[in-house]
Amino acid sequence: MKKNVASVIVDILQNSGVKHCYGIVGDTLNYVTDAIHESKMEWIHVRHEEVGGFAAGAESFISGQLTACAGSCGPGSLHFINGLYESHRNGAPVILIASQLDTNTTDSSFPQYVDFKSVYSECSVFCEEIISPDKAIEVTKNAVSAALSQKGVAVIILPVNISKSEIDYPNKIAVNYHQPRIIPAQGDIKALADVLNKGKKIGIYAGIGSKDARGALLQLAEKLKAPIAHTSRAKDFIEYDNPYNVGMTGMIGIESGFTMLKNCDTLLLLGTDFAWPQFFPEKATIVQVDINLENIGKRHPVNLGLNGDVNETLLQLLPLIDNKTDDDFLRKSVDLHKKTLEKISWLEKGAKAHVIHPQYLAQLLDKHADSDAIFTADGGSAMVWMLRYINTNGQRRTLTSLKHGTMANAMPQALGLKKAFPNRQVISMSGDGGLAMLLGDLLTMTQEKLAAKIVIINNKSLNFVELEQKVEGLLNNYTDLENPDFGKLASALGMFGESVESPEALEDAVIRFLNYNGPAVLNVHTSPNELVMPPNVELNSVVGMGLYTAKAVLHGRSEEAISLIVDNFIRK
């Protein structure tokens, strides 16, 4: 049977599990979009290709399924770059069909020509051009296999003349991939058991590589009487119903997670590529298990490293572990976690404050959201409030830009997740700067009938950048934002829109917003002076904040300094 190359690519992708393709149409993409129209795959028409990259990556990451996006030649496919960088760093298998000019006109001086192979080489696991029609099946199969096996973005560059060329095609081709079992040698597992059995104050630090090892992890913690801290990417899998949980560490962590890691004498790292060595203990014995060999000892020296799947390794390890009886370190760590959560809670006092604190907003969302809701958050302060205050329960999921650290990811990711999970509540915690960057794709919500809920943390500034400037002792420069009334703007676009400025009105507004049957925007005016306090405040940060306060007064900006002190420390 003969089919054109575009139809062959679409057929292979569909047979390999792709349900949705995000993008904007263009002339070099016409045969691809025609093939999608004739298939069971759905086309999601975004207003900016970057949004398509974010959306496809979010769908893939949370669903575990291969997803696609497609763009026209030149600027069209180039616009995907930041969204796909995020997806690639997050380990989301996504296929990009980057359509290209006719093979006879691909030189660097020709209008709209872009060398996609050079552009996408750093943010993909596979990037190849189909140089002749007979290579279409091979390239497409290799792209799918690479995306699934290596967990990343695969790029198929498709010249327009090749897309419409016909080739012989069998009835059905699909690529199926199964993850192999990787288990360390028995001698290495025995050595790991010896280290853990000798430890007195053992701590476990679990990353996203532990997501399938929850049962074995809790059994190990019980035997070792070991508290468990977790990375932000492991929150969904480790945090809930966990009597050993002490929370996160790092810049966006909390006191109990930070303290446990600093005070343990033996630290077991499980499936984590945590990047900040200053949060590791200074004198502890550190052992590590990771399925990726390159991660072992990458961020901090370790005494013993095992290359293997975390769950498979723990199942082999458990019979070799002694049942410890001294639970003093565990008990103190868990007690501190409970006190830390009580200390940072705003549920009781938030409505009585003189401004809306974003922590209170986050806790109200946590209180009233569905038990299986999916949350996204923009990189920056919105990310901190989501990770600290949204509680997981084994059903909820959270997603933000942790490895790439981009702005403007939350709303696009929410669109992709609502498309993938139409019956689940999807809530985006967007910064005002992040949302404004890709504001046009609110129209995608109405056009595609995607009933996502967009909360805007409107502090009228690039808040996280402003905080970084203040910690350095600098005046906050060029971070102010002149925002429209996002509530009225949403209403003008045909969706629910409401703005809230008073703390006492916030809870009712959150309930109305979440219960609305359709796309909705809640514009919440939060304190512009809120500090994202790390779990451990260093002296240089205190000095820097003091310098900022002094400079603000000297430059006639004393009102800013006073507001910062009142909002964060006096909290009237």
Specify the residue positions occupied by each region the protein language model found.
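Thiamine diphosphate
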Residues: I97, T105-Q112, G297-R299, G305-N307, ...
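N-terminal cofactor/phosphate-binding cores enriched in small/glycine residues
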Residues: K2-Y85, R89-N90
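Glycine-rich, anion-gripping cofactor-binding loops and their flanking helix/strand elements
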Residues: F61, I208-V289, N393-R424, A436-G440, ...
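Glycine-rich, acidic loop regions that bind phosphate or pyrophosphate groups
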Residues: A98-E138, A234-S333, V510, L514
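Phosphate/pyrophosphate-binding active-site segments
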Residues: N4, D134, L158, Y169-N171, ...
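Aromatic-enriched
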Residues: V160-G187, S345
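Structural signature of the thiamine diphosphate
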Residues: K2, K19-H20, F61-G71, P75-A98, ...
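Active-site diphosphate/adenylate-binding microenvironment
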Residues: A6-I9, G17-K19, I24-D27, V32-T33, ...
